[in-house]
């Protein structure tokens, strides 16, 4: 096995892995990594690939650079990486054209307003919501809807949701529209662009095994496990976000009887099923034993505990409303088991550094900005430079949304 650092530009991790696998003549499951990176960014991470020499990796460096991928820091590895096997992520961000909101204090300067918002986040943290990228960019169908259909073991419906097109006549949506209208997997495969790895894997399986229940099962199984489980996690993330909003609306920032608190450090997300949690007692509340920073909420699954207060019935009602029972988080046909995990209610940025660029010219990221190349963009408004770290699975977009008080 060999490890490498890996940079991708405007590309999903899973599509990048598929591209590398194709170049190396291996399968995507030969790669292991600690997390899925955002598409709309220049991202770097460590990966491990088995049964591939360093020389083979060096040989593809020039060809993949044309596909917005770079590999570097090649070295031998002795073990695979696991999802969640990282402390967190570091972000470097420039926000351009910063201006005051209409409701802002007219006496406060823009710099004062911005720095005050950042310091509040630094001091109090922010609600640890899953960011919008967890649910996909689709307007007609989002990934949590596909995940719910999979959990209900309606694999045919899930596949139709998977191929539901968005507005527009680009090649991808034309191909999806053709499949929805004809269910002709072979013809759709010819229309689907090469870079749409997931769609092409599914279409190949449908072309071979048919569009019935058995064919749809094999089509879902044609996707690597990490791809299949993402849809389930997306649905569970939606439930967690809604639970967090209900928790804060009902109890605010107070620790209350029946809350779950973590007795371990929560530095991981989807691999943290076994964190020790404690149910807060009346005595704990009276003595202020725990802080709001220790409160966790469960991601639904078959092995998690649920809070012993109004949140318990909320979870039950939410899952029943979606046609699920508490224990139905196993899908044998797709080899998917979802034990659940615990996620901190609040997150805090650390190693936070910020700087107001003001009248300076602002660095504009190019496709290869991550390795030191950049160009200057003339200033058209105030700009803020931010760098900070977040624990695994906390979202920079959510942190920025709280600072900016608008969608990111």
Positions of the model-derived regions?
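Non-catalytic, substrate/partner-engaging modules appended to enzymatic cores
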Residues: 1-408
């Amino acid at each position: 096995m060999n490890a490498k650092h890996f940079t991708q530009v405007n590309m999903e991790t899973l599509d990048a892995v598929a591209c590398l696998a194709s170049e190396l003549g291996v399968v995507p499951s030969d790669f292991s990594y600690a997390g899925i990176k955002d598409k709309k960014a220049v991202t770097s991470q460590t990966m491990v690939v088995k049964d591939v020499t360093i020389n083979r990796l060096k040989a593809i460096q020039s060809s993949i650079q044309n596909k917005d991928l770079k590999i570097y820091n090649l070295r031998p590895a002795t073990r695979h990486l696991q999802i969640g096997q990282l402390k967190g992520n570091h972000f470097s961000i420039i926000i351009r054209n910063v201006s005051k909101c209409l409701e802002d204090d007219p006496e406060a300067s823009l710099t004062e307003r911005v720095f005050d918002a950042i310091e509040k986040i630094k001091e109090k943290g922010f609600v640890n919501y899953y960011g919008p990228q967890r649910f996909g960019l689709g307007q007609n169908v989002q990934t949590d809807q596909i995940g719910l259909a999979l959990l209900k073991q309606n694999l045919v419906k899930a596949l139709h949701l998977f191929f539901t097109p968005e507005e527009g006549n680009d090649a991808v949506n034309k191909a999806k529209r053709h499949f929805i209208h004809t269910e002709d997997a072979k013809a759709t495969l010819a229309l689907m662009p090469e870079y749409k790895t997931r769609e092409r894997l599914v279409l190949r399986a449908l072309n071979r095994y048919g569009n019935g229940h058995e064919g749809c099962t094999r089509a879902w199984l044609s996707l690597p496990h990490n791809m299949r489980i993402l849809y389930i996690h997306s649905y569970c993330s939606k439930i967690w976000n809604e639970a967090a909003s209900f928790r804060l609306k009902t109890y605010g920032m107070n620790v209350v009887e029946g809350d779950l608190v973590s007795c371990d450090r929560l530095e991981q997300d989807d691999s943290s099923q076994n964190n020790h949690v404690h149910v807060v007692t009346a005595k704990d509340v009276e003595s202020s034993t725990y802080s709001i920073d220790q409160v966790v909420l469960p991601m639904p699954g078959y092995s998690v505990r649920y809070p012993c207060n109004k949140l318990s019935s909320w979870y039950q009602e939410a899952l029943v409303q979606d046609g699920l029972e508490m224990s139905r988080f196993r899908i044998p046909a797709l080899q998917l088991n979802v034990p659940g995990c615990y996620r901190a209610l609040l997150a805090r940025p650390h190693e936070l550094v910020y700087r107001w660029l003001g009248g300076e010219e602002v660095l504009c990221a190019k496709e290869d900005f991550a390795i030191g190349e950049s160009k200057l963009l003339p200033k058209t408004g105030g700009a803020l430079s931010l760098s900070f770290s977040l624990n695994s699975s906390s979202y920079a977009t959510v942190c920025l949304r709280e600072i900016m008080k608008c969608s990111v």
